[in-house]
Every structure is written in C-alpha cells, then in structure tokens.
C-alpha cells in the first residue's frame, strides 16, 4: 500500500502540480495524418511490434504510482489506442483504481463503432474523436488515404448509443488545407451536445513540415465562427484546461479553441505523458524522454518516489519561449506520446 502523499503536493520548479496523465498504449496507427504520422515518413507496419510495449500489469502499476503522486485524470492515447488488443480489459483494470476521477480516450474513430459498447461497459467515461474534415475526399486525403468519414461518424453514433453523450471532437486547422471545413464542422455539431474544439497547428515532432505561416490562430477562427453564430466566452471548467471555451449565444452548445502557438498555456500545464514503451515526457514539445522501466521494476512505491524526483526538476515552458528558442535537438514525434 502506497503512503498518502496528499499532505505534500508534488510541484515542479514553477509550482505546477501533476494532475493529468496522457498514457500511450500503442505507437501504431491505422491513419497517416500529415501533421502527425505522414505516410512518406512512417512505414505502414510501424508500432505493431509489441516487444517493447508495456504489459497490462506494468501499465496498471504505472498508473497506480502516478495516482499516488497526485494524478486524478487519465487519458489513453496512441498511436490509435483502439488498435491495442483487449483494450477494454485494460480499461476495466484502470477504472478500478481509487483516485482516478476521469478516465478518457482519444481516437480517430475509425474503429469506434465496433468497440463503443465494450469501452463503456469497461468503465471508460469520456471519448475524444479527432476529425479534421467533413468532406469525404478531403478527410480521406488528410488521413493519408486510410480514413473514411462515414466510419468515423458511425463511430460517434455508436458511442452515443453506448452512453457517451458528450464527446469532444478535435480538429487541427491548417491554412490552405482544411480552413474551409471550419464552418461546416460547427454547423454539423452545433446542438448535438458534443463539443467541437479547434486546435492550432503545432510544431510537434520533426516530420510534419510545420511552419508559422500554416497556423490559423484561434482568434481568427473565433472571429469567423462568431460572424455566423455569435459566441460568448465561458469560464474554464478547471485549472489547467487547455481549451478556451465559448458558448453559442442561441444556447446550442459550445465550441473550444486550443491556442498552443498564439496563446501558450505552459503556466498552468499539469500534464505528463508516457509513451507505450514506458518513457516519461514532461512536455508535448520535449526532445527526449526518461525511461521509467527501471523504476517501474521496483513497484508502485519505488516508481512513485522516482516520479516525485523527476517532476521536482521539471522546468518545461516551450510554447512560452518558442519565438526566442532555436531547437538543437530533434523533438519527439506526436504519435509516440499522443496529443
């Protein structure tokens, strides 16, 4: 049994606690989206080798240790997490851990229709679906020729039927690529109870061809949407929430904006990321990870102690200093640590 560490909250060098864990369960993905895992840079069979992947036992021990040092929110990512064999079994084990207040999953939605019921029954509480276009040909193109929008929409419908009533729908907007999909997406999801969120194109990884000119800022997107459907700002749901929330003035739901490039939120970042092979990344824009497997072999107690030590020296604030920083190390790819 791990000791109660609530009396001594863990903080990094800037006084930021650790509350949110993004845990990748697999590196493989069935899509090849250009801003994450472009087909010309990543082979089709990438990430399918399970030799280095943490087992379910290891993942449960890891999550228990993170809970012991303050984590209350857990999100499963990939790659595409629904490719992980027997994922509902893992979710059932993680959902049973005392202290986990929110258990969510991010998916491209292509496999969601066949798994939605099992995910709900296992204890998954929330789902986020990535969707960068509604137009079928553009959606297929942006997924590297792998995705069909009808499959994703069917997955969302199946999730609703399974009991997931308030999904988040994430759209990464790139200038001259899918800008014209913004208003159609808003029109489609307004009034459904789901929350559409627009994410600025970020310089995560080194193979997505990022350049500042390709960024459509949240302010620009908000103005476009507001001109069609008036918006009013909402307060954050919790400290460290990444999306700026706005309600539709007519009461038909809300829309969110994630502004990592134009309005950095490093100051409130309470998130850590762990890759499928057990490496800790304390920032989405990190250039290298820290292997947790040796500490994991010591069990919950040993790993919890190790995590406290690692977090106490954390000083990441890349988005705040992006303009004045020249990278000398290759940043980790998004598909290794999720979004």
From Swiss-Prot:
Gene3D superfamilies: Aldolase class I
Catalytically driven reaction(s): GTP + AH2 + S-adenosyl-L-methionine = (8S)-3',8-cyclo-7,8-dihydroguanosine 5'-triphosphate + 5'-deoxyadenosine + L-methionine + A + H(+)
Family matches, as InterPro entries: Aldolase_TIM (IPR013785), Elp3/MiaA/NifB-like_rSAM (IPR006638), MoaA (IPR013483), MoaA_NifB_PqqE_Fe-S-bd_CS (IPR000385), MoaA_twitch (IPR010505), MoCo_biosynth_MoaA/MoaC (IPR050105), rSAM (IPR007197)
A Pfam family of this chain: Mob_synth_C
GO molecular function terms listed in the Swiss-Prot or TrEMBL record: 4 iron, 4 sulfur cluster binding; cyclic pyranopterin monophosphate synthase activity; GTP 3',8'-cyclase activity; GTP binding; metal ion binding; S-adenosyl-L-methionine binding
Cofactor(s) this protein requires: [4Fe-4S] cluster
EC number annotated for this UniProt entry: 4.1.99.22
Bound cofactor: record note: Binds 2 [4Fe-4S] clusters. Binds 1 [4Fe-4S] cluster coordinated with 3 cysteines and an exchangeable S-adenosyl-L-methionine and 1 [4Fe-4S] cluster coordinated with 3 cysteines and the GTP-derived substrate.
Pathway per the UniProt entry: Cofactor biosynthesis; molybdopterin biosynthesis
GO biological process: Mo-molybdopterin cofactor biosynthetic process
Enzyme class: lyase
The Radical SAM core domain, residue ranges: 13-249
Sequence positions that bind [4Fe-4S] cluster 1: 29, 33, 36
Domain of life: Bacteria
Keywords: 4Fe-4S, GTP-binding, Iron, Iron-sulfur, Lyase, Metal-binding, Molybdenum cofactor biosynthesis, Nucleotide-binding, S-adenosyl-L-methionine
Residue positions binding GTP: 22, 75, 106, 168, 271-273
Residues holding [4Fe-4S] cluster 2: 266, 269, 283
Protein residues bound to S-adenosyl-L-methionine: 35, 79, 130, 202
Role of this protein: Catalyzes the cyclization of GTP to (8S)-3',8-cyclo-7,8-dihydroguanosine 5'-triphosphate.
Similarity remark: Belongs to the radical SAM superfamily. MoaA family.
Quaternary state and interactors: Monomer and homodimer.
Protein name according to UniProt: GTP 3',8-cyclase
Organism expressing this protein natively: Xanthomonas campestris pv. campestris (strain ATCC 33913 / DSM 3586 / NCPPB 528 / LMG 568 / P 25)
